[in-house]
């Protein structure tokens, strides 16, 4: 967000779950709304270590203060938990406009580097897709009389995966559930062994 010129306000983490603390978040939102002169505000909670950020409550605050909600789901694909009597799943964009994933080597799906932006609706994918291709849009489409014509409407970046990286990432999707299950087993063992430690 800093690269887009946004003023970034960090929020405390609740030590028990290790996720965003809603009380300091609301204080930050009040402060941000006072100083916000234009543009959209964004809340970006992190779902971490297989635990889902309090997305339902973050959605309530986002609506109350007129902010977008973008989940950083890099550490939580396939994660879910009960929040306020409902099952809340990471990466689904049920509560958020967007969710982001990382394909860094230590993540669940790795292909060297890169990432993905998941969108709640198909229309929300237009801007991230355009920004990943130098801000270029092709108004005529590939089947037009001028398929080569394009317009650079934003200052974007070259953030596309290579075909080799994409193939590597796709090949890991079939193993994702098994990998997450293995991590859950290991986390359970650690929790059990460390629960008796001071």
What are these model-predicted stretches?
Residues 1, 55-58, 128, 190:
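Hydrophobic packing residues within well-ordered alpha-helices of enzyme cores
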Residues 1-23:
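Substrate-binding/gating loop at the entrance of the active-site cleft, primarily
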Residues 12, 48, 173:
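Conserved donor-binding loops in enzymes that form glycosidic bonds
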Residues 16-111, 116-118, 122-124:
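Active-site phosphate-binding strand-loop segment of PLP-dependent enzymes
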Residues 75-88, 95-198:
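Active-site region of PLP-dependent enzymes
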């Amino acid at each position: 967000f800093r690269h887009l010129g946004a003023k970034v306000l960090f929020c405390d983490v609740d030590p028990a779950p290790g996720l965003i603390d809603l009380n300091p978040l609301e204080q930050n939102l009040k402060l941000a709304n006072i100083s916000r002169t234009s543009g959209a505000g964004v809340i970006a909670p992190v779902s971490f270590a297989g635990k889902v950020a309090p997305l339902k409550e973050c959605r309530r605050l986002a609506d109350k203060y007129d902010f977008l909600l973008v989940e950083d789901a890099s550490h939580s694909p396939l994660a879910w938990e009960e929040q306020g009597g409902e099952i809340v799943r990471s990466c689904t964009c049920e509560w958020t406009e967007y969710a982001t994933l990382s394909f860094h080597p230590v993540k669940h799906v790795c292909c060297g580097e890169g990432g993905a932006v998941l969108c709640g609706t198909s229309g929300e994918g237009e801007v991230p897709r355009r920004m990943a291709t130098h801000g270029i849009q092709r108004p005529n489409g590939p089947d037009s009389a001028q398929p080569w014509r394009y317009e650079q409407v934003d200052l974007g970046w070259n953030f596309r995966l290579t075909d080799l990286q994409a193939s590597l990432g796709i090949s890991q999707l079939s193993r994702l559930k098994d990998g997450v299950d293995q991590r859950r087993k290991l986390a359970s063992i650690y929790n059990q062994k460390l629960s008796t430690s001071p």
